[in-house]
Regions:
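Catalytic palm active-site di-aspartate
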Residues: 35, 72-75, 91, 126-130, ...
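Conserved pre-catalytic core of RNA-dependent polymerases
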Residues: 4-237, 632-647, 662
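Short, conserved catalytic/metal-binding micro-motifs enriched in Asp/Glu and His
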Residues: 31-42, 91, 163, 180, ...
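Short, conserved micro-motifs composed of acidic
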Residues: 210, 298-348
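Short Cys/His-based metal-binding microdomains
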Residues: 456, 614-662
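Active-site metal-binding core of divalent-cation-utilizing nuclease and nuclease-like domains
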Residues: 616, 668-708
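Extended C-terminal regions of large enzymes
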Residues: 420, 435-617, 621
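Basic, alpha-helical interaction scaffolds
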Residues: 334-412, 467-480
C-alpha cells in the first residue's frame, strides 16, 4: 500500500482565538464527570477569572509545555456483561482534568476537519466518532439494503463481522506516531501528542480501594477526547488496505451502481463480499495487518459469519439433507480468522450496532421481543406507587424512548404497530382516569385543543422512519443517496410494511410549496424574488417533521368530527384551553380536576341527558333552570342561573376581552397623538407697581350655587 499524497488542505496549528476557546468551553456538558481535582466545566463557564486563567494556560501549553495533571487519570471500571468476576468484562473509563480535555478538544476538532477535507477519512467506510454523522443507523441501513438486494436478485452474499480483542487498550504509542506521520500531520501536533503519551499515568479507583499510580505504556484512554480520533487514524490504515479490494471482492447492488466491501464503526468491522473465496482473502489481509501491528489481535469467539445463496436442487444445509426445489437460504461459509473458524449465525442472533441479525433474515423474533419488553415496561410503570399523571410522564419520556431504536432499524408493519398502540391506550386511559370506551384522540391531540399531547406509537414510528429516509437522501455519503433512490424506485416489495420514502418525498414537496407561497406573498407579489430561499438541512428536516405532525393532528380531527358526541370539544374554539403542561399535570393541579376536564372535553361526564339516554332517569331537566335538555354544553356554558351566580368566569373574561379591544385601540390613538408642552415663564414686577394681570380670588355667586 502506498502512502497517500500530501493534502492541499493544511492543518491549522495557530493558537486558538478567544472565540474558538469560548466555543470549546460552552460545548461541554455541565454534568460531565471531572478529573481528580474535582473542577468541572461549570467553573470555567460561570467564573470569568477562571476562564481567563485557563485561556492563558492553554496558550502556553500550545507551544508544547503540557501540565502534568492533564496526563493523569482516575480509571473507573464499568461492568459490561457476562461474568462479573472476570476483569475482561469491565470497561475502563478514564476521568481526566476538564481543563486538559478542553485543550485537546480544540486539537481534535481541527484534526478531524483535516482528515475529512484531505480525503483520508472516507465517510462511506468509517463512521465512528465523526461529529454530525449518524454512523450506526447509516451502516445498518446499508447492510440491510445489501441483504435485501441479494435476496430479491437471488445472488450470493457473504458477510463477516470481526471483533477486536481489547481494541482501545492494544494500540501501541509507536503505531499512533506512525499513523500521524503516514497521514502528513504537522510535526507540531505530532510532538504534542508524543509528549502527552509519554506522560500518561493512571490509577484504578473503586468504592473500596485505589491502586498505585502506574505508567500507561500501551493503549489510549477511554474518556479522552483525542483518543477516538487517534484510534480511527490507526484503524484507517487497515481500511485503506481493504479499499484496494472493493471493486474486486465487494458486493455490487443490482439496482444502483454501488459496491460495498467493508463497513467500520470504530473497531466494529463488517466485510461484505460476493463469494466465499474473496471474503476469506479479505480476512487473511486483516490477519496480516494485525500481525504487523504486533499488539492488536482479533477475538474469534465474538466473530460471526453469514452467507446466503440461491439453492435450486437437493442440498445439505445445517447438517441435514433437505430437498428444496427453489429457495434462497443461508448456509455456513466456514470462514477463518486468526486460524479459527468463525461461528455461523444459527438460531441465536448476532447484534450488529444494535440491530439483531438472524440467519433467516426474518424479523418475527424481534417483534416478539419488542412486544414482550414493551408490555413489561408498561406493567412496571403501572405497578409504581405514583398517581396516574406521573405514570403518563414516565410513558412519555422513558417507555417511548425505548422504542426509538427498534423503530428505526426494523421494518415493521403498521398493523403490528397498531397492536402496540392498542395496548398502550388501555394503560393511558386508566392512568388519565378516562373511560375504557373514551375516544383516544384526547391522549394525543395538542394541549391547545384540550389534549395531553402524548406520543402516539404509530405516529412515532412514522416520524422515525421519515427521519431515517431524510437521512438517507441527504447524507454526505453518495452510496447512501443511490441506495435511497433505488429503494424509492422499487415497488411491490414488502406490501404490508409502510413505506416511509414516498411519504417523506410528499412532505418535502409540501415544505417546498410553502416556501414558494412565501415568495409569492411578499411585497412584490411576483413569485420568487431575485434570490431563491434555501433552507439549511437541519431546518428542512425540522419542517418536514412538523408537516408530518400536522398531518397526524389533521387525521385526529377527522376522527373527532366523525364522533358526534365525543368530538364536542371542537365547538370550544373560543374558550381558553386548560393548561395541561407537565408542570401542572404532575405538580400544581389537582389530578381529579384534570381528569374531569379531560372527560368534559369528550362529553364523557355523566349529565342528565346521558342518564336519560342510558335509561337511568325519566327526565333530562337541568336542576338549576329546569331546562328540558341539560346537556354537557348547557351545563358548562348555557345555564342562565349559573350565569347569574357568576359560575362562568370564562364568559365574563370573554366580555372583558370584547371591551378591551376598543379601549386598547383608543388608548393607542391617544398615545400616538403629538403632545404639546406649554412653556411657562416667570414674570417679575416691582413691588410698588401692580402687575398687568391682577389675580383675584373670586367667590362663587348666588347664581352659581343655584346652578349647582
Amino acid at each position: 500500500m502506498r502512502r497517500p499524497v500530501k493534502p492541499t488542505f493544511s492543518l491549522n496549528v495557530e493558537r486558538p482565538t478567544r472565540a474558538e476557546f469560548r466555543r470549546a468551553v460552552w460545548s461541554k456538558r455541565n454534568a460531565a464527570s471531572p478529573g481528580r481535582n474535582g473542577i468541572n466545566y461549570l467553573v470555567y463557564k460561570k467564573l470569568p477569572a477562571a476562564f481567563d486563567l485557563l485561556y492563558s494556560i492553554i496558550l502556553k501549553a500550545w507551544d508544547g509545555d503540557i501540565p502534568d495533571n492533564w496526563a493523569q487519570a482516575a480509571v473507573v471500571l464499568l461492568f459490561k456483561d457476562e461474568d462479573p468476576a472476570d476483569p475482561a468484562n469491565y470497561r475502563p473509563i478514564a476521568l481526566q482534568s476538564c481543563s486538559g480535555k478542553i485543550f485537546f478538544s480544540i486539537w481534535a476538532k481541527r484534526l478531524e476537519l483535516f482528515m475529512l477535507k484531505s480525503g483520508y477519512f472516507k465517510r462511506a467506510k468509517q463512521k465512528g466518532f465523526l461529529s454530525g454523522v449518524p454512523g450506526c443507523s447509516e451502516h445498518v441501513a446499508t447492510l440491510k439494503a445489501a441483504l435485501r438486494d441479494s435476496r430479491s436478485s437471488y445472488r450470493q452474499i457473504v458477510v463477516a463481522w470481526i471483533d477486536l480483542k481489547n481494541a482501545f487498550g492494544s494500540v501501541s504509542h509507536n503505531l499512533i506516531q506512525f499513523a500521524l506521520e503516514w497521514y502528513h500531520v504537522p510535526t507540531h501536533l505530532a510532538d504534542i501528542i508524543s509528549t502527552y503519551y509519554e506522560m500518561l499515568v493512571a490509577t484504578i479507583e473503586t468504592k473500596d480501594w485505589s491502586s498505585k499510580c502506574f505508567v500507561y505504556e500501551i493503549g489510549v484512554f477511554q474518556g479522552c477526547v483525542l483518543s477516538p480520533l487517534l484510534f480511527s487514524m490507526v484503524f484507517n490504515l487497515l481500511l485503506d488496505m481493504l479499499s484496494l479490494r472493493t471493486e474486486e471482492a465487494g458486493y455490487k447492488f443490482k439496482g444502483c451502481e454501488v459496491t460495498i466491501h467493508d463497513l467500520a464503526y470504530a473497531d466494529d468491522l463488517s466485510i461484505i463480499s460476493r463469494s466465499i473465496t474473496e471474503a476469506q482473502r479479505s480476512l487473511d489481509l486483516i490477519d496480516r495487518f494485525l500481525r504487523w501491528t504486533r499488539t492488536m489481535a482479533a477475538k474469534p469467539s465474538k466473530c460471526r459469519s453469514l452467507a446466503l445463496k440461491y439453492w435450486s436442487n437437493a442440498d445439505d444445509r445445517a447438517g441435514r439433507t433437505r430437498f428444496v426445489e427453489r429457495a434462497y437460504a443461508p448456509f455456513d461459509p466456514e470462514l477463518k480468522i486468526a486460524g479459527q473458524v468463525m461461528k455461523f449465525i444459527a438460531d441465536k442472533s448476532f447484534k450488529f450496532l444494535g440491530w439483531k441479525v438472524y440467519h433467516h433474515l426474518s424479523e418475527s423474533k424481534q417483534k416478539k421481543e419488542i412486544h414482550k419488553e414493551f408490555v413489561e415496561y408498561m406493567d412496571k410503570v403501572d405497578g409504581t406507587f405514583v398517581h396516574g399523571f406521573m405514570k403518563l410522564w414516565l410513558y412519555q419520556h422513558y417507555v417511548v424512548a425505548y422504542l426509538a431504536w427498534p423503530f428505526m432499524v426494523y421494518d415493521l408493519d403498521i398493523s403490528w404497530i397498531s397492536e402496540l398502540e392498542r395496548i398502550a391506550n388501555r394503560y393511558l386511559k386508566k392512568w388519565a382516569g378516562l373511560y375504557a370506551r373514551a375516544v383516544t384522540s384526547v391522549l394525543y391531540r395538542p394541549r391547545d385543543m384540550f389534549g395531553l399531547q402524548l406520543h402516539s406509537i404509530v405516529a412515532f414510528y412514522k416520524r422515525l422512519q421519515i427521519g431515517q429516509s431524510f437521512m438517507l437522501k441527504h447524507s454526505p455519503d453518495e452510496n447512501l443517496n443511490r441506495i435511497y433512490l433505488s429503494m424509492l424506485a422499487r415497488h411491490g416489495a414488502l406490501e404490508r410494511v409502510w413505506k416511509p420514502s414516498p411519504a417523506m418525498e410528499k412532505l418535502e414537496w409540501q415544505v417546498e410549496q410553502k416556501l414558494r407561497f412565501g415568495g409569492q406573498a411578499d411585497r412584490a407579489c411576483m413569485g420568487f424574488g431575485r434570490h431563491k430561499r434555501k433552507l439549511a438541512l437541519a431546518e428542512r428536516k425540522r419542517r418536514v417533521l412538523e408537516a408530518q405532525a400536522s398531518s397526524f393532528f389533521a387525521e385526529l380531527n377527522l376522527l373527532d368530527i366523525d364522533k358526534a358526541m365525543q368530538g364536542c370539544f371542537l365547538r370550544f374554539t373560543d374558550a381558553e384551553p386548560f393548561d395541561l403542561s407537565w408542570r401542572h399535570l404532575i405538580g400544581t393541579r389537582n389530578p381529579r380536576l384534570i381528569t374531569w376536564v379531560l372527560n368534559a372535553s369528550i362529553n364523557s361526564v355523566v349529565t342528565p341527558d346521558l342518564r336519560k339516554l342510558w335509561g337511568l332517569c325519566p327526565s333530562a331537566e337541568c336542576l338549576l333552570c329546569c331546562h328540558s335538555q341539560a346537556s354537557l354544553f348547557h351545563i358548562l356554558v348555557g345555564c342562565p342561573v349559573a350565569l347569574r351566580q357568576l359560575r362562568y368566569s370564562w364568559r365574563h373574561d370573554s366580555v372583558l376581552a370584547t371591551l378591551e379591544e376598543p379601549l386598547r385601540r383608543r388608548l393607542g390613538q391617544h398615545n400616538a397623538s403629538p403632545c404639546v408642552e406649554e412653556k411657562r415663564t416667570i414674570q417679575f414686577h416691582s413691588a410698588n407697581k401692580p402687575s398687568g394681570k391682577r389675580l383675584e380670588r373670586r367667590l362663587p355667586t348666588k347664581n352659581a350655587y343655584c346652578s349647582i
